[in-house]
Amino acid sequence: MQRLCVCVLILALALTAFSEASWKPRSQLQDAPSGPGANGGLEPHWLNRLGPASHHRWQLGLQGPPQQVADLSKKQGPWLEEEEAAYGWMDFGRRSAEDGDQHP
């Protein structure tokens, strides 16, 4: 009996995980315009090639490769400023040594 309950539980979890239920009712999905330019150019063409599961990930707000690359390029600024600040003390040390050589 316990084995049957475990199998039913695993089956229910698998069906839930692999189901492609939409957040919108089916009637709203049919009324929505479709095609490559339907979302005003917001949905990239690579998403259409990945199938319906990717559409649901898009609805959930998960990012694809173009957005991830853009996010990585945004994150370059802060640590570059920290590195420049870290090299400032090295420059100061070099200038101090040069000043010491000029004064006997």
From Swiss-Prot:
One family name in Pfam for this protein: Gastrin
Positions annotated as propeptide: 22-58, 96-104
MF (Gene Ontology): hormone activity
The keyword Phosphoprotein belongs to this UniProt entry's keyword annotation: yes
PTM annotation (Pyrrolidone carboxylic acid): residues: Q59, Q76
Main function: Gastrin stimulates the stomach mucosa to produce and secrete hydrochloric acid and the pancreas to secrete its digestive enzymes. It also stimulates smooth muscle contraction and increases blood circulation and water secretion in the stomach and intestine.
Homology family: Belongs to the gastrin/cholecystokinin family.
Protein name: Gastrin
Organism: Felis catus
Organism ancestry: Eukaryota, Metazoa, Chordata, Craniata, Vertebrata
